[in-house]
Each structure stands twice: as structure tokens, then as C-alpha cells.
């Protein structure tokens, strides 16, 4: 990376020269040395990069490591908590909310207040009580990032029917470490249940530790291809959500639906085209998968690509017709 002491030295040196007394003097020589925030962030990025890069080899390493990492940390905490007044509005899907503030965010009511599952932002809002003389209660919401969750991406894209609502029983196939599962747990609430099936043991361990704090999640570390292995743990469910990314995912979903899903129950499937067939275009893959679902008595209701959030992904929502599809 080319470094021009003049450019950085002048700008940072001049700006921060007033306090600390180092900016002006060392500006030209060390590249705006102790600028940044708190006297370190910018410093070692520009400073040592230019002056000490030649001998000792410290320039590049410290520039990338300290300058970059500390900059990122500032961004993470910002957003809704930055002193802005946040108003929570209910989304048209029950159990999902929108936080209106500096930016509009998709949020769910935290089932385990004070606990963050994957480092997501939390927003505390005072809700006035319905009785006179009772102080307002604090309610915590968790930001649901559509870039981290296919289900959130589908909701942002405008899914009409979700089948996941307060009090519902949901079978979640391909739960991984529980990023989306935790939000589904928030949506169904204490009256609902999420049966989270994951085959890999490493994410499975994280899923189990998360489920310890959320009594409505039942983690099942088992292969979703063999639903008979966990049939004694699950009753009939209202909805099957699948994010398994396997070539035979239509068959996996069908097996679980036939065994656990109520008649007229909902099926929500995230399809990743590359995982099923990377030799044809995504639209062809989606069409083939929808046809396979029809053959398994799942009536497709809508299909939605997750374009701004995920590439070559789509969500298909269907209804399970136990008696068969009418021709």
C-alpha cells in the first residue's frame, strides 16, 4: 500500500493538533501520528506505517490490526441506542415489530431480557402500564438482521403468510447455532414451542447452551433425513421451517411434514440454488424444487427471492394438504 505522509500528516496532524500537543509537531514526520480516537486509532495506522515501515517491519502490521479493528468497534454499538427516541410498532406478522428511530429496524421482543445471542443490538423501551399509578415497565427488543437470517430477509421482502406466530409450534430444520431460531423463539413466545433440529455437533453445542436460557426451544442434535429417530420428542406442529441447503432438501422436508405437520399446516423453505444444482440457473432450480413440493402434497402459496440480502436464494411458502392436492 503506497503511503503519502503529506496527505495524512496534514489532515490529521492539523485537526488534532490543538489538544495533546502532538498533532502539529509530528504531523509531517509521522503521518498524523496520534490522531484517530483516544490517541491511538489513527495513530498507528498512518503513523508507524510511514515512518517505521522501512526498518523493524512494524508499520503494516500495526496499521491494519489496530487502526482497522478499533474503527469497526465504534460502528457496532451505534444505531438505535444512540440517544435517539425509538418507537416500537407492531408488524403485520404477529410477534414481529418495527423499531422506528434514526433508521427503521426489524425487531422481536426478547424472551430472555439482558441476553444477546449472536452479538445483536438490543433496544430497551419503556411501555406505559394500563393501570393508573403503576410505573411503566421496561421491555427489551432484539434487532433481527436480514443479512444474518433468511427468515428476516423474507419478512423484509414482504412475505404474505408466515405461519409463525405467538403460541404456535414450529419445527425448525437446519437450526445451526440458533441465530434465527432465537428470533423464532421470541415470535412464538412462552406459549409456543420451537423444535430445533441440527445435525452438526459444533453448532449444536451453541444451540443447546442458547436453549438453556430459552425454555420454549427444544434442541435436537439429529439428522433431519431420519425423522423417526426423534419422533418421540415432537408432537404435531403448526409449521415446518427448513434451511438445510442439501440437494435432497425437498425429500427431507416432505418426510418431516408427513410425520409431524398438521393438515393445512404451513411450510416455509429457504432454497439455496447452488447447493441443489450449480450447473443450471437459479430460476430453473427453484421451479424444480416447487414441483417436487407439489408431488409431496405441499401446495405452494408464494415464492420470493432474497435479492438484496442473499444471492441466488429464495423462500417458498406452502400449505401442507394431507388429503392431497386438488387437480
Swiss-Prot record:
This is rRNA 2'-O-methyltransferase fibrillarin. InterPro entries: Fibrillarin, Fibrillarin_CS, SAM-dependent_MTases_sf. Belongs to the methyltransferase superfamily. Fibrillarin family. S-adenosyl-L-methionine-dependent methyltransferase that has the ability to methylate both RNAs and proteins. Involved in pre-rRNA processing by catalyzing the site-specific 2'-hydroxyl methylation of ribose moieties in pre-ribosomal RNA. Site specificity is provided by a guide RNA that base pairs with the substrate. Methylation occurs at a characteristic distance from the sequence involved in base pairing with the guide RNA. Involved in the biogenesis of the 18S rRNA. Residues 7-82 have a biased composition (Gly residues). It catalyses: L-glutaminyl-[histone H2A] + S-adenosyl-L-methionine = N(5)-methyl-L-glutaminyl-[histone H2A] + S-adenosyl-L-homocysteine + H(+); a ribonucleotide in rRNA + S-adenosyl-L-methionine = a 2'-O-methylribonucleotide in rRNA + S-adenosyl-L-homocysteine + H(+). There is a cross-link at residue 150 (Glycyl lysine isopeptide (Lys-Gly) (interchain with G-Cter in ubiquitin)).
Amino acid at each position: 500500500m503506497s503511503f503519502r505522509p503529506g496527505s495524512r500528516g496534514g489532515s490529521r496532524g492539523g485537526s488534532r493538533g490543538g489538544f495533546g500537543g502532538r498533532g502539529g509537531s509530528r504531523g509531517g514526520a509521522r503521518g498524523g501520528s496520534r490522531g484517530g480516537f483516544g490517541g491511538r486509532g489513527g495513530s498507528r495506522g498512518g503513523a508507524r506505517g510511514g515512518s517505521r515501515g522501512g526498518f523493524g517491519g512494524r508499520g503494516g502490521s500495526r496499521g491494519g490490526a489496530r487502526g482497522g479493528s478499533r474503527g469497526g468497534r465504534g460502528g457496532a454499538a451505534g444505531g438505535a441506542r444512540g440517544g435517539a427516541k425509538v418507537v416500537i410498532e407492531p408488524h403485520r406478522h404477529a410477534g414481529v415489530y418495527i423499531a422506528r428511530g434514526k433508521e427503521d429496524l426489524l425487531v422481536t421482543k426478547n424472551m430472555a431480557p439482558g441476553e444477546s445471542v449472536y452479538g445483536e443490538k438490543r433496544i430497551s423501551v419503556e411501555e406505559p402500564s394500563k393501570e393508573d399509578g403503576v410505573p411503566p415497565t421496561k421491555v427489551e427488543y432484539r434487532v433481527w438482521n436480514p443479512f444474518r437470517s433468511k427468515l428476516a430477509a423474507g419478512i423484509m421482502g414482504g412475505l404474505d403468510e408466515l405461519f409463525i406466530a405467538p403460541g404456535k409450534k414450529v419445527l425448525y430444520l437446519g437450526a445451526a447455532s440458533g441465530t434465527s431460531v432465537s428470533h423464532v423463539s421470541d415470535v412464538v413466545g412462552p406459549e409456543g414451542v420451537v423444535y430445533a433440529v441440527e445435525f452438526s455437533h459444533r453448532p449444536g453445542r451453541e444451540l443447546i447452551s442458547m436453549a438453556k436460557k430459552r425454555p420454549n426451544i427444544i434442541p435436537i442434535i439429529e439428522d433431519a433425513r431420519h425423522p423417526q429417530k426423534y419422533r418421540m420428542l415432537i408432537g404435531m406442529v403448526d409449521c415446518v421451517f427448513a434451511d438445510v441447503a442439501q440437494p435432497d432438501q425437498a425429500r427431507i422436508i416432505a418426510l418431516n411434514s408427513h410425520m409431524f405437520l398438521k393438515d393445512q399446516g404451513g411450510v416455509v423453505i429457504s432454497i439455496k440454488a447452488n447447493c441443489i444444482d450449480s450447473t443450471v440457473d437459479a430460476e430453473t432450480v427453484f421451479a424444480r424444487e416447487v414441483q417436487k413440493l407439489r408431488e409431496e402434497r405441499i401446495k405452494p402459496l408464494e415464492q420470493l427471492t432474497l435479492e438484496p440480502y442473499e444471492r441466488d436464494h429464495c423462500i417458498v411458502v406452502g400449505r401442507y394438504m394431507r388429503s392431497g392436492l386438488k387437480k
